[in-house]
Amino acid sequence: MAGFLLNTHLLQTATRSRTRRLLNVVVCLGLIFFAGCSRPNNPTANQTTFHQISDESGRTISVPDTVTRYISLAPSLTEIVYAIGAGDGLVGRTSYCNYPAEAQKVEAVGDTLKPSIERIIALRPQVVFVSTASQLEAFTNELESHHIAVYVTDSHDLEGVFHSIERLGDVLGKRANADALLKQLRARVGVVEEAVKSRPPVRVFYQVSDEPLYTIGRDAFITDLVKRAGGVSVTADVPGAWPKYSAESALAAKPDAIVLPTGGSMGDANSNVAAALKRSPAVANGHVYKINDDHLSRPGPRAVDGLEELAHALHPEAFTK
């Protein structure tokens, strides 16, 4: 009887031991299975390598060596992305990004100054491109806490625009395309500058809006466009980029030409000269020029279109054959 009990005890002990081993195996297999299920959708996510660069505001940021998903929060930057052949990786844009037509198929994440941070994060971009440092404080820290780099462009003249094209080409792996585009753009700029270089500069008042009256200051890249087109902005020394300006001061400057950026995204807005300026030499001589706002106000590739249109308006005789 004692032997039977001992054998029974040993059998039970062995059975419990096998059961524990089996449970351990099952648990281990389960952990392996669930660990595999919890891996990121991108099997190379943990293999991504980064490098540090400086954006155009002087900030040091880390970007992947290969950037495949990105968002643009400025129409000009969206235009650059497509112009250098990088549109396939654009996963988000602002509601103002309307050119080229393909851009409108990309999901909008709000406007330039108040984008939806939640939507941006959900789209999983590696880099978000913004056009001015003034946008940074609102969302940079939150985006970077989700490992999203924020690259800032900062163009105060046409060379600054070209530099932005070059840098986006670097970040997006499209430098050869960017260089080819820049070669074409610089050639067109050269044609304009050669045509107007011997012409006396035209005094220009650039009316951003009439009520209230806003214009361009020394920090606006459009001030450089006016100069390259054979003009001189009468507000070139005013601090800032888009200063509010008194009608009396504008009239006292006696502009020979008034430029109204209208059409494009602005529609019919800003299509009338401010009341006080109707007594200016520009109006008296019929030198009021309406030019597509999207070409003039966006520091991207089409700024050269704006330069050509502006030069033809200020110096039509320089382009007649």
Where are the model-predicted features located?
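Bacterial signal peptide processing site
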Residues: 38-41
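C-terminal motif of bacterial Sec signal peptides marking the signal peptidase cleavage site
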Residues: 33-36
